[in-house]
Amino acid sequence: MPRSLKKGPFVDDHLLKKVDLQNSKGTKHVIKTWSRRSTVIPDMLGHTIAVHDGRKHVPVFITEGMVGHKLGEFAPTRTFRGHVKEDRRSRRG
């Protein structure tokens, strides 16, 4: 169920402060965050945000198509290594 329009998008305060500070200074340093639940807003365009995936921080460059999505969508938490190919030695019979 989508969030109510009167509430607006959710962005953690500490992340919003860091983005606003860099926008006012005109710098584009990497912002490290654990806030996967924050929504991408237009103020973040052009910034690189390192989103934590549970093990490391994945750098995500924010573009127009990402606005409205959550940061966690761009840093997958699970790595699928593929199914093991059928092993003839393990089958007996």
UniProtKB/Swiss-Prot annotation:
PROSITE patterns from the UniProt entry: RIBOSOMAL_S19
Alphabetized GO MF terms: rRNA binding; structural constituent of ribosome
GO biological process assignments: ribosomal small subunit assembly; translation
Gene Ontology CC entries for this record: cytoplasm; small ribosomal subunit
UniProt KW RNA-binding keyword: yes
Keyword Membrane listed: no
InterPro entries to which the protein is assigned, alphabetical: Ribosomal_uS19 (IPR002222), Ribosomal_uS19_bac-type (IPR005732), Ribosomal_uS19_CS (IPR020934), Ribosomal_uS19_SF (IPR023575)
Keywords: Ribonucleoprotein, Ribosomal protein, RNA-binding, rRNA-binding
Signal peptide segment: none
Pfam families, sorted: Ribosomal_S19
Family: Belongs to the universal ribosomal protein uS19 family.
Function: Protein S19 forms a complex with S13 that binds strongly to the 16S ribosomal RNA.
Name of the protein described by the UniProt record: Small ribosomal subunit protein uS19
Species, as recorded: Frankia casuarinae (strain DSM 45818 / CECT 9043 / HFP020203 / CcI3)
Lineage of source species: Bacteria, Bacillati, Actinomycetota, Actinomycetes, Frankiales
